[in-house]
Regions:
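Hydrophobic/aromatic beta-strand elements that line small-molecule binding cavities or substrate pockets
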Residues: 30-32, 85-91, 105, 113-121, ...
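Glycine-rich portal/gate segments that line the openings of hydrophobic small-molecule binding cavities
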Residues: 53, 62-109, 163-177
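A short, structured loop/turn motif at beta-sheet edges
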Residues: 35-39, 90-97, 118-128, 170, ...
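Intrinsic-disorder/low-complexity, polar/charged segments enriched in Ser/Thr/Lys/Arg/Asp/Glu/Gln
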Residues: 25-33, 74, 84, 98, ...
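A conserved amphipathic terminal alpha-helix motif
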Residues: 128, 135-177
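Bacterial N-terminal signal peptides
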Residues: 6-16
Length: 177
């Protein structure tokens, strides 16, 4: 009986590993040019515990552990439409105007998600913001349903990045900002 249990357990691990390996690595990269100095754009967007100040899809952003902008910090994002996303800060470079983070729990149709957010000066009043991520779909099965497939995962992250970057641009470029 112990032998049979060990075989079943080993097979289940093997099947899980094969499914994980079979699901393709997906990626999204979005950029936007903002008519403002890089320091101004970075100041508006750098706070790990402040995404809700410029991303229109968020109702709130709560730091649940750690210290803001310190590796290991964990934030809980509450979406306006319902649901939450928990993310962990993996890297923060103040001088380089960049941070890296991972999703650790989410209502989004993605898994194994890692992202980089970078603010790059293109001159006195011109800045490029790049938001990129690599991930897999949440449903790693062979035949995921519509809404759980690769397209749904890519579309969800594309929407997150596009709406966030568009609103960041609007806020930073607003008169008096």
């Amino acid at each position: 009986m112990k032998m049979m249990t060990a075989i079943v357990f080993t097979l289940s691990l093997t099947v899980s590993a094969v499914a994980l390996a079979a699901a393709p690595q997906l990626s999204v990269k979005k950029t936007i040019t903002i008519a403002a100095a890089a320091d101004k754009v970075w100041e508006a967007s750098k706070n790990f515990n402040g995404l809700n100040t410029w991303h229109p899809a968020l109702a709130s952003d709560e730091l649940v552990s750690g210290t803001n902008n310190t590796v290991g910090a964990v934030r809980l994002l509450t979406l306006k439409g319902g649901g939450t996303v928990k993310e962990k800060l993996l890297g923060f470079d103040e001088a380089g105007h960049r941070y890296r983070y991972a999703i650790i729990e989410s209502v989004l149709p993605v898994s194994h998600y890692r992202s980089v957010f970078v603010v790059t000066s293109l001159g006195k009043d011109k800045t490029l913001v790049t938001w990129s991520g690599r991930f897999k779909r949440k449903n790693l099965g062979d035949s995921p349903a519509d809404g759980e497939n690769d397209k749904a995962a890519v579309d969800a992250i594309t929407g997150v990045y596009t709406s966030g970057l568009d609103n960041l641009k609007k806020i930073v470029e607003a008169p008096g900002a």
